[in-house]
Amino acid sequence: MASEDKFESVLSTRYCKNSPLVSILSETNKATLWRQLWIWLAEAEKELGLKQVTQDAIDEMKSNRDVFDWPFIRSEERKLKHDVMAHNHAFGKLCPTAAGIIHLGATSCFVQDNADLIAYRDSIDHILKRFATVIDRLAAFSLKNKEVVTVGRTHYQTASLVTVGKRGVLWAQELLMAFQSLSEFRDKMRFRGIKGATGTQDSFLTLFAGDESKVEALDELVTKKANFSNRFLITGQTYSRQQDSQLVFSLSLLGAAAKKVCTDIRVLQAFGELLEPFEKDQIGSSAMPYKKNPMKSERCCALSRKLINAPQEALTILADQGLERTLDDSAGRRMLIPDVLLTAEALLTTLQNIFEGLSVQTDNVKKIVEDEIAFLGLEKAMMMLTEEGVDRQQAHAVIRKTALEAKQLQATQKVDIRQTMADPFFDSVRDRVVGLVNNPINFTGRCVSQTESFIAKELKPTIDKYLDKSAGNVQLDV
């Protein structure tokens, strides 16, 4: 059956079809990891002295690790209703010498949980590299526009001047904090290890004739072979699903940060100040050919919503895990965590494309500043007046009255700074303020130095470990 004739997740077929995550999270990779875990377990058991595990058996497992008889596996699972045992039988069929020691001492969660954790770790490593590139692209945009003066907005209303670059590093800070959360999770992530059917390690204690030190060594050795630095010291049958919730929450922070950034871009595109990349043959509307819609930012907001809402499901999976283990978690985890990882990848890929082509509509930005500078210069006037001993509250009251009257005039005519400062109250500072208005950068405070400092002192050092400096630009298929 052709792929177009059956339903497939849009994450893997539309938004992430060229991503390595599609392979990392695939059934084949999962099954390969299960077999690799069986190999590591056998190697470690042999190294610690189990006579029934032979080198011939291990070599046979290694040589057949990547050979899959999928029709047989599906047939076995249909009959047994147990995926791990179906794969166990299939691997044993390929490896008759090893069949008797495959899965020795283990429970299903040895392969299921540990393989999931390896796949999650590898996915996170890729996502962190992508994330670092996204933040780096936004930093470049911010530095490029660090001196481009624009109207600040609080409550979506005109506020004191900022620069486009300073606004860019505010966005970068939100993304960087989410990046740090995910990076910290990655560094602390724990492997399940070998714990047995209910977490007591009794089966392994039996195999090693009651020698607890060898059971501890086996747990450490398998963890090391899987290239994890940390492991759970205690588990039930499964590792704590709180770790899954922490992963999902870290990615939900990415979703929230990205939605804030992309909502801002959409608003600023509506104001005519920014324009997300619009490709040569791109069509904005089937009915209105003149439109340039911020569809990439809109897509990011939609993907972000999925990440923002995901922790609720992860928390219920954690809460419903009964005693040493129930299957309340199984179906949910199979769907939730791969979807969250792929959604994060789709979001970051689209964000990277936006930041690589985001442009400032400088003429319109300049016009908006010129229209508002007559009002925005009054804050500077208030500070100057207080320097001369004027009561700050008195200055505020006079400026408020003057500005509101001028705002009414602005509806029908252009207002300049001399009109808003016509009151004799401003005589001592008027010329100084008017002189500054000719160069609006004078009203942006430390925007330029803040932008440079944040990128140099915080942003760059944080992402450097994961940043691929040779990464090319992203081209979106849709």
UniProtKB/Swiss-Prot annotation:
PROSITE patterns: FUMARATE_LYASES (PS00163). It catalyses: N(6)-(1,2-dicarboxyethyl)-AMP = fumarate + AMP; (2S)-2-[5-amino-1-(5-phospho-beta-D-ribosyl)imidazole-4-carboxamido]succinate = 5-amino-1-(5-phospho-beta-D-ribosyl)imidazole-4-carboxamide + fumarate. The active site is at H155, S285. It comes from the Eukaryota. GO terms for molecular function: (S)-2-(5-amino-1-(5-phospho-D-ribosyl)imidazole-4-carboxamido) succinate lyase (fumarate-forming) activity; N6-(1,2-dicarboxyethyl)AMP AMP-lyase (fumarate-forming) activity. It holds the Pfam family Lyase_1. The keyword tRNA processing does not apply. Disulfide bonds: none annotated. CDD domains: Adenylsuccinate_lyase_2. Its EC number is 4.3.2.2. Pathway: Purine metabolism; AMP biosynthesis via de novo pathway; AMP from IMP: step 2/2; Purine metabolism; IMP biosynthesis via de novo pathway; 5-amino-1-(5-phospho-D-ribosyl)imidazole-4-carboxamide from 5-amino-1-(5-phospho-D-ribosyl)imidazole-4-carboxylate: step 2/2. Substrate binds at R14, Y15, K81, H82, D83, T107, S108, Q237, R299, R325, S330, R334. Keywords: Lyase, Purine biosynthesis. One of its GO terms (biological process) is 'de novo' IMP biosynthetic process. SMART domains: ADSL_C. GO terms for cellular component: cytosol. Homotetramer. Residues from neighboring subunits contribute catalytic and substrate-binding residues to each active site. Catalyzes two non-sequential steps in de novo AMP synthesis: converts (S)-2-(5-amino-1-(5-phospho-D-ribosyl)imidazole-4-carboxamido)succinate (SAICAR) to fumarate plus 5-amino-1-(5-phospho-D-ribosyl)imidazole-4-carboxamide, and thereby also contributes to de novo IMP synthesis, and converts succinyladenosine monophosphate (SAMP) to AMP and fumarate. Belongs to the lyase 1 family. Adenylosuccinate lyase subfamily. This is Adenylosuccinate lyase.
